[in-house]
């Protein structure tokens, strides 16, 4: 006969074993060059992931701009997801090949803010991020601009320069795929803090899901279009989450940025989101910061 206290002990051991089995998701942040303050923003990205208790985070930093890049050869395959906070010199050919293979074979990738300005000459990278801006991109060379109208994606083939934003102001973000795991359970419309609202991004725009948009206000030098802010892209077996938000640490304090980033990294890594929507999420009219 088994004593009751032994049974309780056994059950508790099982619970402990189950929790221990949920191994943390391994994340690699890449940085080292950017026209943004990457030395300030990478520690914020790292902390935001670590504070969920679901991730362990390493950082791979490239040599500085203009230096020999041949030493930059991270072992992407050791991670479930790579987050780019990089916008700079081309990577060595071997690293480019390794990264393409990594995502094509099912590795996760997250393009954060100006990472979608990077590598205009790298075709596979443009396919991963779907759309990008600046870097002398023109719509006629890179692919259509992506706008949202009439409840669906509209590919805008008019020629033009890709990548623009007005002054940093608060703006509303509207979910367009509310059942997507990254945003499921979050408010349909929420007020983001002062940030750059990217407009006129262009690219191959293949295998693209627009998760959320924002209206680019002509009164703030905008396009008058609903522009993609959060996107999900398939590249081979890999999942890509593309967030245009988070210009600086102040913009990254928005709970809307924080939560969509944390959930987007988990989704890119695993295809699932286990994080619950928080209680302090912004509403349609009020920002919320942490
Ligand atoms: Zn910016």
Give short role names for the model-derived ranges.
Residues 18-22:
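Sec/Tat signal peptide C-region and signal peptidase I cleavage site
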Residues 5-17:
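Bacterial N-terminal signal peptides
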Residues 106-110, 211, 241:
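Structural detector of well-ordered beta-strand residues that form the stable sheet scaffold
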Residues 89-181:
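A glycine-rich, often tryptophan-bearing local segment used as a flexible ligand/cofactor-contacting loop or short
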Residues 23-25, 40-41, 51, 74, ...:
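Extracellular ligand-binding/catalytic regions of CAZymes and related secreted enzymes
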Residues 50, 56-58, 78, 146-236:
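Catalytic beta-strand/loop cores that center a nucleophilic Ser/Cys/Thr
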Residues 34-35, 89, 116-118, 188, ...:
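Short, solvent-exposed loop/turn segments at secondary-structure junctions
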Residues 26-119:
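Helical hinge/lid and interdomain linker segments adjacent to catalytic or ligand-binding clefts
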């Amino acid at each position: 006969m088994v004593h009751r206290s032994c049974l309780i002990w056994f059950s508790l051991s099982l619970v402990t074993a189950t929790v221990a089995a949920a191994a943390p998701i391994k994340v690699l942040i890449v940085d080292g060059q950017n026209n943004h303050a990457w030395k300030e923003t990478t520690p914020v990205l790292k902390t935001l992931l670590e504070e969920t208790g679901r991730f362990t985070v390493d950082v791979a930093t490239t040599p500085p701009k203009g230096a020999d890049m041949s030493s930059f050869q991270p072992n992407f395959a050791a991670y479930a997801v790579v987050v780019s906070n990089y916008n700079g010199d081309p990577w060595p050919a071997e690293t480019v090949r390794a990264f393409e293979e990594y995502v094509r074979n099912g590795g996760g990738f997250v393009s954060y803010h100006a990472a979608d300005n990077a590598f205009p000459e790298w075709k596979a990278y443009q396919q991963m991020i779907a759309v990008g801006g600046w870097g002398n991109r023109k719509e006629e060379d890179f692919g259509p601009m992506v706008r949202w109208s009439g409840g669906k994606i509209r590919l805008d083939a008019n020629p033009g320069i890709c990548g623009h934003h007005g002054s940093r102001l608060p703006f509303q973000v509207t979910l367009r795929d509310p059942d997507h795991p990254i945003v499921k359970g979050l408010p349909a419309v929420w007020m983001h803090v002062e940030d750059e609202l990217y407009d006129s991004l262009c690219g191959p725009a293949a295998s693209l899901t627009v998760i959320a948009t924002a209206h680019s206000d002509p009164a703030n030098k905008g396009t008058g279009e609903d522009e993609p802010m959060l996107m999900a892209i398939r590249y081979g077996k890999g999942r890509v989450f593309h967030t245009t938000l988070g210009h600086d640490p102040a913009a990254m304090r928005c709970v809307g940025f924080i939560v969509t980033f944390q959930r987007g990294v988990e989704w890119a890594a695993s295809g699932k989101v286990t994080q619950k929507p928080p209680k302090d999420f912004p509403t349609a009219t009020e920002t919320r910061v942490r």
